[in-house]
C-alpha cells in the first residue's frame, strides 16, 4: 500500500515535539516545526539538531523549523500539538485563524488544564471545533524514540478514519501505533501517570527496594483507574500501553522528567530547585494539585496522590506517602469493575 504523504505541523519544539517531527520526516512527510524563539528555529535549520532538548539527535532535512504559526500551519493536513498544558490554550488561541478546516489535530500533551479541569482534547474542541481531534499517548520517552529504539504508542479518537490516518503516517519499523476509541481514558492515563512518576522518583531517592517500587506502581494503577472510571473512562484502557505501559516507563526510567523531579525532591531539594535543575516542563507537578483537589471533590479514594500533594505543596515528610500506602483502608487487589463503565 502506498503511504499518503502529508504536510504536517508540529506545534512545540520540546523533546517530544522534536521526536514526532523526526519520525514524520523520516517517513517521507513534509514537516514544519513551530518554536517560539526565532534564534532556536534558525539554529535547528542550520545545525539539523535541537541542542536544548535532544542534543545529538540529527533531524532529517524534511524538517523546517519556524517561529511563525502562519507559516507552520499553512497547508497542513495534520497538526501535532506538543505544548505544555499551562500554555496550551494560549497557543490554540494564537493559532486559531491559521488552522485548516478538517485538519487532523493530535494532542501529544500529557497534562490537565487547571481552569475547569479540562483535558487537552477538550480544549481543542473549544478552540478548533472545525478540526478532527485525537490524542497520542503511551510509553514514549523522546530520547529513545529519536534513537529508534522500538516503541509502541496509542492513537485515540472516536473517529476511526483519523486513527487509521495517524497509524499510517507514524508507523515504521521502530514505532508501532495501536488504536483505541476511548480518547478520554487514553488521555487521562497519560496525565495521571505523571503524578506517580514523581512519587516513584522520590521513593528511589530514599532507596526503597524493588518490592516497594512494584507495590507503589501497582497501587498507583489502581488509583488511576478508580479516578478515571469516576470521570467516565473505560477501566480496560488502563491495562494497555497508555495506562500501565506508560506508568511503568515513567516510574522506572531516569529519562522521565517527572521521575527526575521526584528524585531531586527525595534528595531534599526544594520544588523550585528541582524544577530549575530539570530545565524543562514536568507536567506531574501541576497535575498533583489538580487531581488531589478533584479527588476530594468527587470523593475518590487516592491515598498516594493525596499524600504526594501534602508533601510537595505543604512540606510534609516523605514518610507520609509510605504511611498512607501501608495504613490506608483495606481494598481488593484488583479493582477493575467493568460494571462501573458506561460508554
Curated annotation (Swiss-Prot):
InterPro entries, A to Z = 6-PGluconate_DH-like_C_sf, 6PGD_dom2, G3P_DH_NAD-dep, G3P_DH_NAD-dep_C, G3P_DH_NAD-dep_N, NAD(P)-bd_dom_sf
**GO MF entries:** glycerol-3-phosphate dehydrogenase [NAD(P)+] activity; NAD binding
Enzyme Commission (EC) number:
1.1.1.94
Q: Which UniProt keywords apply?
A: Cytoplasm, Lipid biosynthesis, Lipid metabolism, NAD, NADP, Nucleotide-binding, Oxidoreductase, Phospholipid biosynthesis, Phospholipid metabolism
Domain of life of the native organism: Bacteria
In what pathway does it function? Membrane lipid metabolism; glycerophospholipid metabolism
Q: Which residues bind sn-glycerol 3-phosphate?
A: 110, 138, 193, 246, 256-258
Cell compartment(s), UniProt: Cytoplasm
One GO term (biological process) = glycerophospholipid biosynthetic process
Q: What class of enzyme is it?
A: oxidoreductase
Gene3D superfamilies according to UniProt:
N-(1-d-carboxylethyl)-l-norvaline Dehydrogenase, domain 2, NAD(P)-binding Rossmann-like Domain
User: Can you state which reaction this protein catalyses?
Assistant: sn-glycerol 3-phosphate + NAD(+) = dihydroxyacetone phosphate + NADH + H(+); sn-glycerol 3-phosphate + NADP(+) = dihydroxyacetone phosphate + NADPH + H(+)
Q: Which Pfam families match?
A: NAD_Gly3P_dh_C, NAD_Gly3P_dh_N
Mainly resides where? cytoplasm
Q: Name one GO cellular component term.
A: cytosol
The residues that hold NADPH are 15-16, 36, 110, 142, 257, 283
Q: Where is the active site?
A: 193
User: According to its UniProt record, which protein family does this protein belong to?
Assistant: Belongs to the NAD-dependent glycerol-3-phosphate dehydrogenase family.
Sum up the protein's function in the record's words: Catalyzes the reduction of the glycolytic intermediate dihydroxyacetone phosphate (DHAP) to sn-glycerol 3-phosphate (G3P), the key precursor for phospholipid synthesis.
Protein name, UniProt field: Glycerol-3-phosphate dehydrogenase [NAD(P)+]
Which organism is this protein's natural source?
Alcanivorax borkumensis (strain ATCC 700651 / DSM 11573 / NCIMB 13689 / SK2)
Q: Which gene encodes it?
A: gpsA
Amino acid at each position: 500500500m502506498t503511504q499518503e504523504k502529508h504536510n504536517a505541523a508540529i506545534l512545540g519544539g520540546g523533546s517530544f515535539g522534536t521526536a514526532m517531527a523526526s519520525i514524520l520526516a523520516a517517513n517521507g512527510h513534509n514537516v514544519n516545526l513551530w518554536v517560539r524563539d526565532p534564534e532556536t528555529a534558525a539554529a535547528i535549520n542550520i545545525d539539523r539538531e535541537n541542542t536544548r532538548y535532544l542534543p545529538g539527535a540529527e533531524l532529517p532535512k524534511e524538517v523546517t523549523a519556524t517561529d511563525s504559526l502562519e507559516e507552520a500551519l499553512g497547508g497542513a493536513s495534520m497538526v501535532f500539538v506538543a505544548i505544555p498544558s499551562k500554555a496550551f490554550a494560549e497557543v490554540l488561541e494564537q493559532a486559531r485563524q491559521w488552522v485548516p478546516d478538517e485538519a487532523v489535530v493530535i494532542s501529544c500533551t500529557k497534562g490537565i488544564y487547571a481552569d475547569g479541569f479540562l483535558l487537552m482534547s477538550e480544549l481543542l474542541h473549544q478552540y478548533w471545533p472545525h478540526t478532527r481531534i485525537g490524542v497520542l499517548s503511551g510509553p514514549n520517552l523522546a530520547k529513545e524514540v529519536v534513537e529508534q529504539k522500538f516503541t509502541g504508542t496509542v492513537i485515540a479518537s472516536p473517529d476511526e478514519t483519523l486513527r487509521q490516518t495517524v497509524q499510517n503516517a507514524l508507523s515504521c519499523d521502530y514505532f508501532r501505533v495501536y488504536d483505541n476509541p476511548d480518547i478520554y481514558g487514553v488521555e487521562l492515563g497519560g496525565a495521571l501517570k505523571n503524578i506517580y512518576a514523581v512519587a516513584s522518583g522520590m521513593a528511589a531517592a530514599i532507596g526503597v527496594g524493588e518490592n516497594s517500587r512494584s507495590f507503589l506502581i501497582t497501587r498507583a494503577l489502581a488509583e488511576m483507574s478508580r479516578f478515571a472510571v469516576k470521570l467516565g473512562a473505560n477501566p480496560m484502557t488502563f491495562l494497555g500501553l497508555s495506562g500501565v505501559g506508560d506508568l511503568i516507563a515513567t516510574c522506572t526510567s531516569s529519562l522521565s522528567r517527572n521521575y527526575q523531579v521526584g528524585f531531586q525532591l527525595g534528595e531534599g531539594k526544594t520544588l523550585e530547585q528541582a524544577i530549575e535543575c530539570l530545565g524543562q516542563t514536568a507536567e506531574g507537578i501541576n497535575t498533583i494539585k489538580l487531581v488531589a483537589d478533584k479527588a476530594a471533590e468527587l470523593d475518590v479514594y487516592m491515598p498516594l496522590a493525596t499524600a504526594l500533594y501534602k508533601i510537595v505543596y505543604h512540606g510534609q515528610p516523605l514518610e507520609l506517602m509510605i504511611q498512607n500506602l501501608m495504613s490506608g483502608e483495606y481494598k481488593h487487589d484488583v479493582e477493575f469493575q467493568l460494571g462501573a463503565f458506561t460508554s
